[in-house]
A protein has these predicted regions:
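Secondary-structure boundary/capping micro-motif
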Residues: 1-254, 259-338
Length: 338
């Protein structure tokens, strides 16, 4: 849970600056010039890693600008981009990623806290379908209002993004989407100037840690357990309920399902301080000690593979990637009972 003392709300003046630059961007209609995969990489002053901007709306009806911070953020971008080809539920990916996103949308979709800011600044939009609002996404938390640091980051980012879009409009830069080209804007400290150029879009994969159980005595104990004719499915899902706090959290549910005889083996919410790796590994150790080595584990979530690849190989348990559609049914049933 976020420490209340660490969160600072943005001032009215900061919000005004953010809306001022966003309204300038709005007039340029950046979605007419950049596709959502044509990332704009901006290396801001005094920041070690760049930010990556994805402009949405050229190929869909939803207009917006998503900003991903650093290499980890770039991994989140590609994780979401690959959602249509993968097996992880779209809602899970939204709850799993971190970004600062601006939407152009219906007045009815504007969060209450954002509406208060808009009213206080007395901002008027063209139609009820053209309201501009901002959402902070953070892994494990509910979408929330931007804080002071996030507003400041977007102001600086959008000021530079404006220069990029204007250069594309004027024909000074011409990234080709078919060639997977984006744009880089960076500050040159040697000559104290900003430079912009077309470059191939950077690529990155979302990194998931993998672990090796170091307790050799425990590993041998697990390996020597009898093997039983059982196939187990493991999965994670974020529940659509809210855990109150300075920033409300998304409860993360761990599930183990008996895919041989049918039925849930265990289902529990991760506690404060727990994580996907420790919970998955903890289940494996406890289950094998009590019941024996399952024959197969099926999963679609990369956290599970990071936790179990090494120990499953050591214990001769097949760890298999599978869409595990049955878990979507289980999740739907769980959610319906909330």
């Amino acid at each position: 849970m976020e420490d209340k003392s660490l969160r600072k709300e943005a001032s009215k003046n900061a919000w005004k600056q953010l809306y001022d630059i966003t309204l300038k961007l709005d007039k340029l209609e950046p979605w007419n010039y950049l596709g959502d995969t044509q990332l704009v990489t901006i290396q801001l002053k005094d920041r070690e890693e760049p930010v990556f901007c994805s402009v949405m709306g050229k190929f869909s009806g939803e207009r917006g600008i998503a900003v991903f911070d650093g290499v980890e953020g770039l991994g989140d971008f590609y994780m979401i981009l690959g959602s249509e080809e993968g097996d992880l539920p779209a809602q899970y990916l939204m709850d799993e990623h971190t970004s600062l996103t601006c939407f152009w949308g219906s007045m009815m979709n504007v969060p209450d806290e954002q509406r208060k800011v808009i009213d206080e600044l007395d901002i008027r939009f063209k139609t009820i379908s053209d309201w501009i609002y901002f959402v902070s996404y953070k892994k494990g938390y509910k979408p929330y209002q931007l804080d002071e640091d996030e507003v400041a980051l977007l102001i600086e980012t959008y000021e530079n993004l404006y220069m990029v879009v204007e250069a594309v409009r004027q024909g000074e830069l011409n990234p080709e989407i078919e060639q997977a080209e984006g744009i880089v804007r960076r500050y040159n400290t040697e000559n104290d100037t900003w430079e912009m150029f077309v470059k191939e879009i950077p690529e990155a994969e979302k990194e998931f840690p993998s672990v090796m159980l170091e307790d050799q005595e425990l590993k041998d104990e697990l390996k020597n357990q009898k093997q039983i004719d059982l196939e187990v499915i493991l999965d994670f899902t974020y529940l659509p309920v809210m855990v109150e706090g300075e920033r409300p959290k998304n409860p993360l549910l761990f599930m183990a399902y008996d895919n041989t005889d049918g039925g849930v083996i265990t289902m529990d919410i991760l506690e404060e301080g727990d994580d996907e790796i420790s919970r998955t590994l903890g289940f494996f150790i406890s289950f094998v000690q009590q019941n024996g080595r399952m024959k197969t584990i099926k999963a679609r979530n990369p956290w599970i593979f990071g936790a179990l690849e090494d120990i499953c190989e050591y214990c001769s348990v097949d760890l298999v990637y599978d869409p595990v559609e049955i878990m979507d049914q289980v999740i739907e049933e769980v959610v319906s009972q909330l």
